[in-house]
Amino acid sequence: MLLWPLLLLLLLLPTLALLRQQRSQDARLSWLAGLQHRVAWGALVWAATWQRRRLEQSTLHVHQSQQQALRWCLQGAQRPHCSLRRSTDISTFRNHLPLTKASQTQQEDSGEQPLPPTSNQDLGEASLQATLLGLAALNKAYPEVLAQGRTARVTLTSPWPRPLPWPGNTLGQVGTPGTKDPRALLLDALRSPGLRALEAGTAVELLDVFLGLETDGEELAGAIAAGNPGAPLRERAAELREALEQGPRGLALRLWPKLQVVVTLDAGGQAEAVAALGALWCQGLAFFSPAYAASGGVLGLNLQPEQPHGLYLLPPGAPFIELLPVKEGTQEEAASTLLLAEAQQGKEYELVLTDRASLTRCRLGDVVRVVGAYNQCPVVRFICRLDQTLSVRGEDIGEDLFSEALGRAVGQWAGAKLLDHGCVESSILDSSAGSAPHYEVFVALRGLRNLSEENRDKLDHCLQEASPRYKSLRFWGSVGPARVHLVGQGAFRALRAALAACPSSPFPPAMPRVLRHRHLAQCLQERVVS
């Protein structure tokens, strides 16, 4: 019953926003903006408090919460499982529904691996919970961020798992509501020197924004000076030019001296961009992600922004999640799954999601390591995605192992900073004709314009140090050395545009690092500069 007052407030807020927009030129109605902000924030705080209480109860009674989630799945199934509908016994459920994999063979020519068929409607409550709790956590850590005119989003996508129709403009977010022009979003942000928070859908999208700002900075400064759009701001345009002339390091704080935090949605393949942004453009700023978006719409919640980046709570409510233990060096098909309360600290597990519509238990491929607990629920760090494994001779180089080896190799390239990378097995590009199969590795760097042969060889050496199996195959000549290519600026932006155009692509938010389709690999191959 308490939900109805909140819904009434939400219905009133768009009307207030419209009235504010229509009468924004009338100084006599400036009080309306303050009223609108107070009403919006009061509704948000109330809703977040309600969601937090629900989360506390569910994490204190994990087994009961997961039983309810399982019952929710069984009742919503679109195919008959009569024996299951009458029982939520976990053993019966597991015996009737064997584990399946998100197939790597059912790929469309125009995209990456399709995700499990989880309904957005089914996951709506989980995404709403992540958004409300994330906003509350952000406000607690940075109280001034959600004040009027202190936040700007610079990408079309939002970092909030379920962007609400009212908080952005109502809570004073900079920019025109509903704009579909990324350039307009960036211009609105650049015109506002008092920002406290910068939002972007994901870290890789924000990386593209800053790279584009370096390229198009003079054009953007000219638009600000000319008042296109808005009033002419010649002094602000001069500040933009001066900030860009000093290079990328610390650029965000030069543009917005009061900036405190960067808000992006965490997902697979984003850590590299976060590191690059933190070392260069966003140096000195905190990063906050309200959630981790795993495969199939599963969300890990970030309830404590002050903790180390990358720790997330796996909530026990719908959708129904199980954990499949990962054995070192193998993935046992016959291993039994565990419930959330049975997870052990220090162990690694693959997430298993039950799709409500098809009643399918699907192995998502997302591997987590349990690092702590919140009440009775595991707090995890997402380690890797099994579908991002490289294997040309059965060597199985995992995403985490490859990223670590690449990081060590780049660390030996004097002056180089890794911005982006993508991998392709040689068979995709038919580049192993007359030679052993190998990896084609494409990198985007800052601080290094050419790769020497010595630089290229270091990645292969690091891979051999990291994987005895790979080293053995290299020794016998069964696998050729990894070939490293430097791509020009804009290569990965073009790749992301191609990915975003694919309906079955996981991007955004997840960024694939192993490309399985020729046309995607060619986005990088065609832009090699060294």
Swiss-Prot record:
Disulfide feature: none
Post-translational modification: Methylated at Gln-489 by N6AMT1.
GO MF annotations, alphabetized: acid-amino acid ligase activity
Chain positions with N5-methylglutamine modification: 489
Region (Disordered): 99-122
Keywords assigned: Endoplasmic reticulum, Glycoprotein, Methylation, Nucleus, Signal
Top-level taxon in the UniProt lineage: Eukaryota
Location(s), subcellular: Endoplasmic reticulum; Nucleus envelope
Glycosylation sites: 450
Leader peptide range in chain numbering: 1-17
GO cellular component terms given for this protein: cytoplasm; endoplasmic reticulum; extracellular region; membrane; nuclear envelope; secretory granule lumen; specific granule lumen
PANTHER family in the cross-refs: GH3 DOMAIN-CONTAINING PROTEIN
Family: Belongs to the GH3 family.
Protein name listed in UniProt: GH3 domain-containing protein
Chain's gene name: GHDC
